[in-house]
From Swiss-Prot:
Family indicated by similarity: Belongs to the Maf family.
Name used for this protein in its record: Nucleoside triphosphate pyrophosphatase
Disulfide bonds: none
Organism: Prochlorococcus marinus (strain NATL2A)
GO molecular function: nucleoside triphosphate diphosphatase activity
Protein's UniProt keywords contain Cytoplasm: yes
Pfam families: Maf (PF02545)
Origin organism lineage: Bacteria, Bacillati, Cyanobacteriota, Cyanophyceae, Synechococcales
Keywords: Cytoplasm, Hydrolase, Nucleotide metabolism
Reactions listed under catalytic activity: a ribonucleoside 5'-triphosphate + H2O = a ribonucleoside 5'-phosphate + diphosphate + H(+); a 2'-deoxyribonucleoside 5'-triphosphate + H2O = a 2'-deoxyribonucleoside 5'-phosphate + diphosphate + H(+)
SUPFAM superfamilies according to UniProt: ITPase-like (SSF52972)
């Protein structure tokens, strides 16, 4: 069994897509604690903090670690001209950002922290230090030129407010993306190629396609 340290429905759907049976344990980590201006370092640190927090919760709640093989923490943000765009706080901010993003491009960064729990004891620190790997996957996204009508119409839906950058490529936001360079699933919330490669490094590829 695999543990996903995220409440993101989009990430859960990606794991369902590859038939990776999983349990969701949401991290208690307060993201506002981390004030890091570098977007790539920030998502990397946040992914690790979320994974460590979920691992701590797993142990404190007396879950039998031998029933789980791996745990994944993720965090995503959108970088636009050196500025970090996380989830928009309101409609006004979303519209302002989309007016700037229209016809331009930026980068969706997702930090990943994978912890192997195979044959692990209940020592959280040693597990995290000795059986983990982390990395950041970045995808360049180019947007179409949008009218104010299109921007306002999208801002009137609930979709963009739960997404880094204020768009969901797998939803209505996909209408406004001209092209991407890089990993598609990374834009949704986690890079499936990154996950596959690193599960293989831990000898855990058996977890994939477990229908």
């Amino acid at each position: 069994m695999f543990v996903l340290a995220s409440a993101s429905k989009a990430r859960q759907k990606l794991l369902d897509q590859i038939a990776l049976r999983h349990k969701v344990i949401v991290s208690d980590f307060d993201e506002t604690q981390l004030q890091e201006p570098d977007p790539i370092l920030k998502v990397k640190l946040l992914a690790k903090a979320k994974a460590d927090s979920a691992l701590k919760k797993l142990i404190e709640e007396n879950h039998a670690l031998n029933t789980y093989q791996a745990l994944l923490g993720c965090d995503s943000l959108f970088e636009f001209k050196g500025e970090i765009f996380e989830k928009p706080i309101d409609k006004e901010q979303l519209i302002s950002r989309w007016q700037r993003m229209s016809g331009q491009s930026g980068f969706l960064h997702t930090g990943h922290c994978l912890i192997s729990l195979d044959n692990s004891k209940s020592d959280r620190e040693s597990i995290s230090q000795n059986n983990s790997c982390d990395g950041v996957v970045s995808t360049r996204i180019e947007f179409m030129n949008l009218s104010n009508f299109e921007i306002n119409k999208y801002a009137s839906t609930s979709e963009p407010y739960n997404c880094a950058g204020g768009f969901a490529i797998e939803g209505n936001g996909g209408l406004f993306i001209k092209k991407i360079d890089g990993c598609f699933s990374n834009v949704i919330g986690l890079s499936l190629p990154w996950l596959k490669n690193n599960l293989e490094k831990f000898g855990l590829s058996r977890l994939l396609l477990d229908r």
